């Protein structure tokens, strides 16, 4: 196996490429992937143009340049946007109709990097849908002509006009789709950017005079300096330890809510006025209600909203109550994007705080979701906790991972027990792993795409019952099967 091939095999994941800088990713591999992207996109879509963005990690701009050189070497036309968030890259792809490459490792720690790939119009791409083809084509790429030449490796430069147009167009779209320029009452928001790309977005979206009327929106940023070494805390809001600072700031300042973005700012977690981290399902239900209302106001009878199968049952209940039609999906970025296009869905939400919008080219945007929450809160005279109370009535387990020797055997044990009624009466389906759905509860066990483990989630009406169901299922899944 060649060095390029071995690096690719380590970096290629289910939905993107990700690895350690130096060990897995270097300029040569990024050059080859740019070359492979053009060859693949030209063959599949007849396009040779590619938009390329980079996050704030120390190697990201250099990697973006290597991608651009590879695109050009394959006869393509790269547009290098420079520093941007992942959802800005999706916006640029959607607006231009070109495929996109985003250099980012999202919430991974310092020392990691990667590439998120989208097709024309920000379409999702899976392994089978194009990632494998790009990787295979990359193996045939010539060497990077800039190798060993620092001056050549500093080229090409970002296009300042394209970057400026992106920032303005993105901000205008966020404002127009959420109505944050016309808030009914003043609000104070604490936004923890985690030294990630949200630090660039805050002044672009909120830092204009237009947001001062008719009611002021006071957005106070934390850790806004772009620094891919993450000196304050990892930009991973999935870990509760990384929410402590913004939670304290919200309570100490008496703010109305807090926001916590991940490194590439495509996800945003929301903190209520008490400092409590809100459920991504509750936020998804709130945004779904607003997107359904927008679509119905535009004449759509029964707007479709997608939700993955491990979001709270409050999500489909809210969708139906708002006049929409819920569609349940497997977990996974590229699959949801494809299903959004098939169903012409107005919105989609995942338990992981990925929120997708039809009017944002079907792509996910943490900032767009955050602004929906701000606008929804401003329409009330109350608190965020009160606004979300009826959208978060159930007790969920959260996702619990179990490392097992044989994931397929673990799933089979759960499937057999569920069908036998061991955990209560219900129906069993295999949309993604195995799900048992009862009259007032559900439980799901599904395999990881990349590791020898299974993931468990469940939800019931109360915490005690959820704890009991969790213990029973995990005991079965883990029984006699530890590696």
Where do the language-model regions lie?
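An N-terminal, well-structured beta->alpha segment
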Residues: 1-67, 73-74, 163-186
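N-terminal small/polar loop signature for handling phosphorylated ligands or for N-terminal nucleophile
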Residues: 39, 49-112, 204-271
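Gly/Ser/Thr-enriched, mixed-charge loops and adjacent short helices
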Residues: 113-253
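A short, gly/pro- and small-residue-rich
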Residues: 111-140, 271-287, 360-371, 377
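Proline/glycine-rich low-complexity loops and linkers
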Residues: 129-172, 176, 273-351, 355-357
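Phosphate-binding and adjacent anionic-ligand microenvironments
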Residues: 257, 297-483
